[in-house]
Amino acid sequence: MTSPRVSFVVVTHARPRWLSGALESIRPQSIADREIVVVVNGPDPETQQLLRALGSEVRVTVLDRNCGVSGGRNAGIALARGEILLFLDDDAELRDRETAERVLTHFERDVDLGIVGFLVIDATTGAAERRVVPFRDKRLPHGVTEASYFPGGACAIRRRVFDSIGLYDASLFYAGEELDLSLRALDAGFRILFDPSVTVMHHGAEGVGASTAPYFYARNRPWVALRHLPLPCCVTHTLGWWAWSLARGVRAGAVASALCGIRDCVAGMPRIWRERRPVSRHTRRFLARNGGRLWY
């Protein structure tokens, strides 16, 4: 069987109503040479019933437990057959039926292009979600711009990236997995583009809750820094993200979550140290020039 050019990959966890909207936004895509892959991140009867009704239109894998964002995406990568994998969160929708065609044009023009990130629009306000704009200052560029990371729930990735550098780090579960992959991709010579004209509508359904997020940020962001960045940058990342997680924990009444994240971060640092592969000087210079997450 000939492999499709594009695989649309959606990871879902107990959100069938939102998943239905995501799939409906994929179906009108103008590209014919495509497939749709859905990863059910832990058994959910309602979601599975919805997918059964779609029949062979969707390729489905059901994981025996919730493996997190990174583990779920890895399962989707394993099932997908396309040359380009277009990832969409289950509570998001493509806004343009030409999205895949436009993204393919970028990859066809540049053999070293590994990842294209999209602009995420808040479905309630109609404004850009600045927190996932892949630049430190969060300002929107006027056109297609080279970037140092990308929004994982609204992006397209060339399969060769995964073949070359491996999959997402499943141990991260949630938070920091895109940055980890970005640093490895950049260091392997792949380029990342951010195209603000390719947009995704995000409904912001409840995922990892406000009481849980401080744990993952406190644990994961220092790990990613320790694995890839110079030691002075590791110090600023660690202190900065621990402070941020504690502040967020205070606002959410979840200080204990942040403290547990700090505890588990420290406990896991010996393992991360053994995995440490700092990026090259060339990559560090690129991060400094292009608004990358070098110091925080």
What do these predicted regions represent?
Residues 1-25:
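N-proximal low-complexity "stem/linker" segments adjacent to membrane-targeting elements
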Residues 23-62:
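Acidic donor-binding segment of Leloir-type glycosyltransferases
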